[in-house]
């Protein structure tokens, strides 16, 4: 993960001097709204993308639920996001996206912090509550943040801005899973989850969710740091 971040920074500086860059780095170095909105997106995906992976393991190996029941529980978050995102997108047309997206990131932080207390005895209802908080947080963050990114560039750079959103999403997902696999390998190694190492798995999950909540908190400040969004026509 650290090597990937280092190489990513080197890549950005190389692109800055390249004759035909893959990424228009002037948008990152000169456009505050564009840069911090993308940073917030990267942090958000890095902090949240491993949730489904971790909770699916928890529900099946700790709660002993089947794949179908586990999937239906986890589905709470994306369904809420899908239902609310169109509303929050329109909301960000009337309220500054910085405020809406930052509130969403704060809710994601809260949801992750709730999950950091995961125990074998944690009720499914409490888990659903955390997923509801996360679902609302995702909805408040995602559409307004994308709105801020797309609105911060001129028409000629809309394709670049859209590609950057996708890049931040995929990079964040890879980082999130990389961190999760690293921590799990430290706590339980290559062993399958079984009664003898369930407590180690729970400990690893708590460490991960607490770390992700701290990362998400940094994302709140990154989101606020974008400043007022001056939409470019």
Where are these regions (language model features)?
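Hydrophobic core of alpha-helical transmembrane segments in multi-pass integral membrane proteins
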Residues: 1-13
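Interfacial non-cytosolic loop connecting adjacent transmembrane helices
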Residues: 193-198
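Short, charged juxtamembrane terminal tails flanking transmembrane helices
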Residues: 229-233
